[in-house]
Amino acid sequence: RRQRQMCIRDRFPGTYFHIGGDECPKSSWKNCPACQARIKAEGLKTDKNHTAEERLQSYVIQRMEKMLAKHGKKIIGWDEILEGGLSPEATVMSWRGEAGGIASALQDHDAIMTPGGNGMYLDTFQGDSKIEPVSIGGYTLLEKVYSYNPVPDTLVTLGKDKHIKGVQANHWSEYMYNTDIMEYRMYPRMLAVSEIAWTPLDKKDYKDFERRINNAYVRLDGHDVNYHIPQPEQPNGSCNFVAFVDSTSLTFKTTRPETMVYTLDGTDPTPLSTQYTEPIKVTETTTLKIRTVLPSGKMSPVRNITVEKQALAPAKVVEKTTPGLKMKMADGTFFKASELNKATEWKEMTVKSLRDIRSQVESTESMRGVKQYGAIATGYVDIPEDGVYYFTTNNDEVWIDGKLLISNEGEVKRFSRNDKSVALAKGLHELKVVFLGHIIGGWPSLWDDASISIRKADQEKFTPIKPEQLFY
C-alpha cells in the first residue's frame, strides 16, 4: 500500500488530487455483505440527514483524505461527496447544477463550479442535432457558455463567495471518435469559458466577444485547430431531403449572425456565391447547396439538400386489416440490413406497436447482458390527411410503399441525421421497419425504443406513430 501511495505522490506533483466520487450506486451497497459489515464495524448509522450507506461513502473519502494529506495533498471530489458529510479539507466540484457548490461554500469549504445545465459541458450539441456530429445530447450555444456566472448571488450576499475558487468546463469524450471532433466541440466555447473565469462580471459583453471571436478564428487557423462554424439550419429540424407538391420555400438561420451563401446549379458555394437574404422559393426538383462563410473567408461544410417535386403517393386499398404489424426476428449481431439475408432461423409473430419491435432478452453471453437480434416488421401505416410528411427514426431502415425512405446504416443510432420527407395521400401506406440489435460507437441500439415520429410540413413538432395507426 505504501508503494502505491508513493507512486501517487510522484505521478501527481500538484497540491490537489481529484478522487472522483460521483455516481456511486449506494442502493447496491444495501445488499453487499462486505459494505454492511463495514457499516456495522464503523458504527455508521442512518439519521435524518444521511443514510448509513451515504455515511459509508464519507468514511471512505475521509480515509483517502488522511492518506493523501500525509503526502501534502488536498482532495477534490464531485458534489456527491456531500451526501455523507464533507471531509474536513475537501473541495467540491459542483456538476449537478450549482447546489453542491453553494452547499459546500455555506459549510466554509471551497468549491469549483462546473454545472452541465449552465453550459459547462462541452460535449453537448452547439447546433441542430440533425446536421451535427452525434453527441451525448443537450444543447449549449456559445452565448449560454459566455453568460454563465460561476459565483452565485446567494453566496455574494452571505459573504461566502470567496469559497468559489474557479470554474471548469468538462469535455467527456465517449462520442468524440477523433481529434477533429474533439476540437470541433471544444472551440470556440472554450474561449468563452476562459473569459468567464478571468473577466470581471461588469466587464462582460457578449456582443463584443462575438465580434472578437472572428479574430480568434484566424489564430486557431494558424495552429490548425478545428472549430465549430454555425451551419445553415432549417426551422423545426433540418432535413437534407425536402419533398413538395406544388412549390416550397426553404428558410434558413444560423445560431450566430453569419453570412450564408448558396447555389442551385449543383456547384459548391464559394464566398462569392449568392447570399441568402430571404426564403428560397423552389418550384421544380433541384439540388440546393448552402453553407456559412466567415469574415476570414473560411466556410462551413456544404449542406446538400435535395428538393424534390412529388405527386401524392396513393393510398393502398386493403379489404381487411388487423391492428398491429407482422414481425420476424433472427438471433445474432447484424450491422447491415443486407446481413439479414444470411439468417436461417426466424421467429414470426405480431406486435401491437413500433416499440414492441425492440425486446430485451437477458443473455450472459452478450455485451450489455441482452441478446442481440435483427427484426423486420411489415404492415401499413394510416396517414391522417393528404400532405408532405417528415419522418425521423433511429431504426436502421424505414420503407414506405416499397421504397427505402430512411437508412441509418453504419451510424451511431442516436439523434438520426437522415430524416426525409415524402408526399402521401390520406389512407394506408405500406410500411417496413428494419431494426438491428448491435453496438456502434459505444451506443447499443437496444437502448433505443424503435419508434418512428412524423410531422406534416406545416407542423412544428414530431409526434410518434401511434399503435392505432398500424395495421397488417
Task: Name every feature range the model reports, one short phrase each.
Residues 1-2, 27-52:
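Aromatic- and acidic-residue-enriched carbohydrate-binding clefts of CAZyme catalytic domains
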Residues 3-8:
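Short, small-residue-biased leader/transition segments that mark boundaries at the very start
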Residues 12-16, 40-260, 377:
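Substrate-binding groove of N-acetylhexosamine-processing glycoside hydrolases
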Residues 22-26, 81-83:
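Short, internal active-site loops enriched in acidic
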Residues 33-42, 92, 127-130, 344, ...:
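Short secondary-structure boundary/capping segments
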Residues 204, 210-382, 388, 392-394, ...:
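Short, compositionally stereotyped local motifs that mark structural "simplifiers"
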